[in-house]
């Protein structure tokens, strides 16, 4: 069965709407990756993911470290991203890859039907060039309307996957 992958920053995690986020990044303060909010309604998202997992889907996260970060800062980022994931979505994701900035995320594809949700156009292009579907989310900085559109797109797409599995089993 396929894996449904999510980026974190700007996709599930609201990095860019935190006060002083850029200053925290520049000061290599890893807490910037654990003190923000979710960009999706947590209980609804968790319910949908749990139902799809019952149908055999796996769920994963592929997220980058900060650009040109030191080993020490990279370890802090990993710690804080995992802290946020475990607090916000406990035991929801089957696999989490926190990798060097710019890593080709399509290297983590596990089946021909894997999909990715990401807000980075270049990431989606690489993913699609590898023969897989990427749902590109819009930049949600300073826009509640765009955040709501992205959340709706995620929920709608996951619901479609759920329906296709149910129809195939009939």
Task: Please name every model-derived segment.
Residues 97-127:
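Conserved Lys-Pro-Asp/Glu-containing loop-to-beta segment of HAD-superfamily phosphomonoesterases
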Residues 3-5, 9-84:
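Alpha-helical substrate-recognition element adjacent to the catalytic core
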Residues 2, 94, 114:
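Conserved acidic residues
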Residues 120-170:
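Asp-based, Mg2+/Mn2+-dependent phosphohydrolase catalytic module
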Residues 13-16, 59, 67-72, 104-108, ...:
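Short catalytic/ligand-binding loop motif for oxyanion handling, primarily in non-cytosolic enzymes
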Residues 61-63, 116, 136:
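Structural beta-sheet core signal
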Residues 63-67, 95-104, 139:
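Acidic carboxylate-rich catalytic motifs and surrounding loops in phosphoryl-/glycosyl-chemistry enzymes
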Residues 92, 112, 130-131:
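Short, structured coil segments at secondary-structure junctions
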């Amino acid at each position: 069965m396929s894996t449904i992958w999510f980026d974190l920053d700007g996709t599930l995690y609201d990095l860019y709407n935190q006060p002083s986020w850029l200053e925290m990044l520049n000061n290599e303060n890893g807490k910037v990756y654990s003190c923000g909010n979710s960009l999706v309604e947590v209980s609804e998202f968790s319910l949908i993911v749990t139902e799809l997992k019952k149908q055999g889907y796996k769920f994963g996260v592929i997220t980058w470290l900060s650009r040109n970060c030191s080993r020490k800062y990279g370890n802090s980022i990993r710690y804080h991203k995992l802290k946020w994931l475990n607090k916000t979505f406990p035991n929801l994701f089957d696999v989490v890859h926190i990798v060097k900035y710019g890593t080709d995320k399509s290297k983590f594809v596990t089946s021909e039907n894997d999909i990715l949700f990401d807000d980075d156009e270049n990431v989606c292009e690489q993913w699609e060039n590898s023969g897989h579907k990427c749902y590109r989310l819009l930049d949600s900085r300073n826009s509640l309307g765009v955040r709501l559109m992205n959340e709706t797109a995620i929920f709608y797409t996951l619901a479609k996957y759920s329906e296709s599995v149910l129809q195939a089993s009939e």
